[in-house]
Amino acid sequence: MGPTRTTPEPVRLTAAMRHDLTRAVGRALAPSAVLPRAEDVEELTVRLRGYAMCLVPEVEDRVGGMEQGATEWREATSALDDARRALGAGPGAGLRSAVGHMQELGRVCHRLRCHLPLGRVNGSES
């Protein structure tokens, strides 16, 4: 028996959403010598949170079809655990902690995305 679903049914990502997700993850994880503006951090955090909430149920669906205990299953369930932890956390007090939270959401989205088929768009393989 696979892990219990903790989220609503998946909202499948479109090709445009996948492209935007890739750009958002890149922005969140781009190295910078200075902290970004608070407004930019907030906007990107909201976007990444939304994507993580879409990705979690998709990965949960995939995990349900995996062999329990296999390497892929362990990596996917670890990514799900990290995503749930990040989604349950807040940005904290101050810009530095908000940037850290945004970056964590970027890493979470990247890890979750790695557990989906590359061509998956709206629930079908392309």
Question: Regions from the language model: what does each represent?
Answer:
Residues 42-46, 70-77, 96-103:
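Short, charged, amphipathic alpha-helical segments
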Residues 40-60:
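Hydrophobic alpha-helical packing segments in soluble, helical-rich domains
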Residues 1-44:
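Short terminal alpha-helical segments
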Residues 21-24, 51, 55, 79, ...:
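Amphipathic, well-ordered alpha-helical segments in soluble domains
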Residues 78-126:
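Amphipathic alpha-helical binding modules
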